[in-house]
Amino acid sequence: MNITFIGSGYVGLVSGIIMGYLGHNVTCLDNDDVKISKLNKKILPIYEAKLDEYLKHALESDRLKFTNIYSNEFRNFDAIFITVGTPSKELGEADLKYVYDAVDKVSKHINKDCLIVIKSTVPPGSCNNIIAYLKAKGFSFNVASNPEFLREGSAVEDFLYPDRIVVGVNNKESEALLRKIYAPLIEQGAKFLVTNLVTSELIKYVSNSFLATKIAFINEMADLCEKIGANIKDLSQGVGLDQRIGRNFLNAGPGFGGSCFPKDILALNNLVENHKIDCKILKSVIKSNKLRPSNMVAKIATLLDGDLKGRNIAILGLTYKAGTDDVRASPAIEIITILLNKDVYVKAFDPIGLENAKKNLEHKNLLYFASAVEACKSVDIIVIATEWSEFKELNWQEIYNLVKSPMIIDLRNILDNEVMKKIGFRYYAVGSQI
């Protein structure tokens, strides 16, 4: 089928490339000329495991192209997927200006049978509002909701082998078209859930907010473990082995970040407040996660006898999680910002997200390094802020010989306590007593 993705950011790019790989004729549009030029040269603007292989395959199969121009070629498309950003406004409400801008532009170029699919994360009721908006302008296009559930770092696998495909429609024609588009995945067993527009939109918000709640809860249980001497890793495993709960998102750490969880839980909280519902759980999760970076800094300060000013601290890991170059709302960046405000000298390293971190945060007391070993030279403490597997493989004996003070605080619980102590480090992890 002939389909287009408007917005070649993370969601649009991954979705478009894989749809091309699955056999559809795909056009990805973005208003960033530099990005489009690079993509046409097979240069990805994001890091995502295996995505470069699928990009090459789709381009060489002549099923994928990139453009920055809305044209009459759009009249040949069966569906237009809107995958632009929906950033948060000041009070947490989703800003839909990019969605409406995309809808405005495509409506002038597509045929009357083309389906407009909203894949951007939008508040419940948005698709119905878009239908009314188009009708007021004299258009009667079908509009569907199709939220994405891709995890950065494993997005290719998530798209090819999804837990479920959710679509919100208001007629059989839209459902039939989406079934055709997703046929390669449905045929291999993917669950295809059809619901109404509002429910489909709400599923995305509730899914992300529930996962954020699991993270916030286990983080607070880690604090309890520190007080009473319980083992947070064993606790997470013991709880997660219950099939009613599940093991995923029960890893204690410095809080959740990224482009989705913080934004989506704020938007859901804004939605319930607009409907006069006092959802105390959402408020508590938002507050808990907001305080988490400060709590991590407090732990670091405790290990340094309460004296942070003038200290040299290595931060290993800058992205909000491993497997991505995304530093948006990264707990590591938040922690660094707090430390810099306390006159700390920070030496930072990340295996993938270094360049994005440099664009995001600059300071006279902040130095970025091309290797973890270099970042750790002559520091008072090493902070593991992101769960990169590379950190497990570092030559920690070499690092031990380079540091000023052999102390590690592992905010992701990825290193082996006994191994670190055998080398000579004072090792502390989230959920262990300080």
UniProtKB/Swiss-Prot annotation:
<dbReference type="InterPro" id="IPR036291">
    <property type="entry name" value="NAD(P)-bd_dom_sf"/>
</dbReference>
<feature type="binding site">
    <location>
        <position position="257"/>
    </location>
    <ligand>
        <name>substrate</name>
    </ligand>
</feature>
<dbReference type="InterPro" id="IPR014026">
    <property type="entry name" value="UDP-Glc/GDP-Man_DH_dimer"/>
</dbReference>
<dbReference type="GO" id="GO:0051287">
    <property type="term" value="F:NAD binding"/>
</dbReference>
<dbReference type="InterPro" id="IPR014027">
    <property type="entry name" value="UDP-Glc/GDP-Man_DH_C"/>
</dbReference>
<protein>
    <recommendedName>
        <fullName>UDP-glucose 6-dehydrogenase</fullName>
        <ecNumber>1.1.1.22</ecNumber>
    </recommendedName>
</protein>
<feature type="binding site">
    <location>
        <position position="30"/>
    </location>
    <ligand>
        <name>NAD(+)</name>
    </ligand>
</feature>
<dbReference type="GO" id="GO:0000271">
    <property type="term" value="P:polysaccharide biosynthetic process"/>
</dbReference>
<dbReference type="Pfam" id="PF00984">
    <property type="entry name" value="UDPG_MGDP_dh"/>
</dbReference>
<feature type="binding site">
    <location>
        <position position="152"/>
    </location>
    <ligand>
        <name>NAD(+)</name>
    </ligand>
</feature>
<comment type="pathway">
    <text>Nucleotide-sugar biosynthesis; UDP-alpha-D-glucuronate biosynthesis; UDP-alpha-D-glucuronate from UDP-alpha-D-glucose: step 1/1.</text>
</comment>
<feature type="binding site">
    <location>
        <position position="263"/>
    </location>
    <ligand>
        <name>NAD(+)</name>
    </ligand>
</feature>
<dbReference type="InterPro" id="IPR036220">
    <property type="entry name" value="UDP-Glc/GDP-Man_DH_C_sf"/>
</dbReference>
<dbReference type="InterPro" id="IPR028357">
    <property type="entry name" value="UDPglc_DH_bac"/>
</dbReference>
<feature type="binding site">
    <location>
        <position position="208"/>
    </location>
    <ligand>
        <name>substrate</name>
    </ligand>
</feature>
<feature type="binding site">
    <location>
        <position position="204"/>
    </location>
    <ligand>
        <name>substrate</name>
    </ligand>
</feature>
<feature type="binding site">
    <location>
        <position position="321"/>
    </location>
    <ligand>
        <name>substrate</name>
    </ligand>
</feature>
<feature type="binding site">
    <location>
        <position position="121"/>
    </location>
    <ligand>
        <name>NAD(+)</name>
    </ligand>
</feature>
<feature type="binding site">
    <location>
        <begin position="148"/>
        <end position="152"/>
    </location>
    <ligand>
        <name>substrate</name>
    </ligand>
</feature>
<feature type="binding site">
    <location>
        <begin position="249"/>
        <end position="253"/>
    </location>
    <ligand>
        <name>substrate</name>
    </ligand>
</feature>
<dbReference type="Pfam" id="PF03720">
    <property type="entry name" value="UDPG_MGDP_dh_C"/>
</dbReference>
<feature type="binding site">
    <location>
        <position position="11"/>
    </location>
    <ligand>
        <name>NAD(+)</name>
    </ligand>
</feature>
<keyword id="KW-0520">NAD</keyword>
<dbReference type="InterPro" id="IPR008927">
    <property type="entry name" value="6-PGluconate_DH-like_C_sf"/>
</dbReference>
<dbReference type="GO" id="GO:0003979">
    <property type="term" value="F:UDP-glucose 6-dehydrogenase activity"/>
</dbReference>
<dbReference type="InterPro" id="IPR001732">
    <property type="entry name" value="UDP-Glc/GDP-Man_DH_N"/>
</dbReference>
<keyword id="KW-0560">Oxidoreductase</keyword>
<dbReference type="InterPro" id="IPR017476">
    <property type="entry name" value="UDP-Glc/GDP-Man"/>
</dbReference>
<dbReference type="GO" id="GO:0006065">
    <property type="term" value="P:UDP-glucuronate biosynthetic process"/>
</dbReference>
<dbReference type="Pfam" id="PF03721">
    <property type="entry name" value="UDPG_MGDP_dh_N"/>
</dbReference>
<feature type="binding site">
    <location>
        <position position="328"/>
    </location>
    <ligand>
        <name>NAD(+)</name>
    </ligand>
</feature>
<feature type="binding site">
    <location>
        <begin position="2"/>
        <end position="19"/>
    </location>
    <ligand>
        <name>NAD(+)</name>
    </ligand>
</feature>
<feature type="binding site">
    <location>
        <position position="35"/>
    </location>
    <ligand>
        <name>NAD(+)</name>
    </ligand>
</feature>
<feature type="active site" description="Nucleophile">
    <location>
        <position position="260"/>
    </location>
</feature>
<comment type="similarity">
    <text>Belongs to the UDP-glucose/GDP-mannose dehydrogenase family.</text>
</comment>
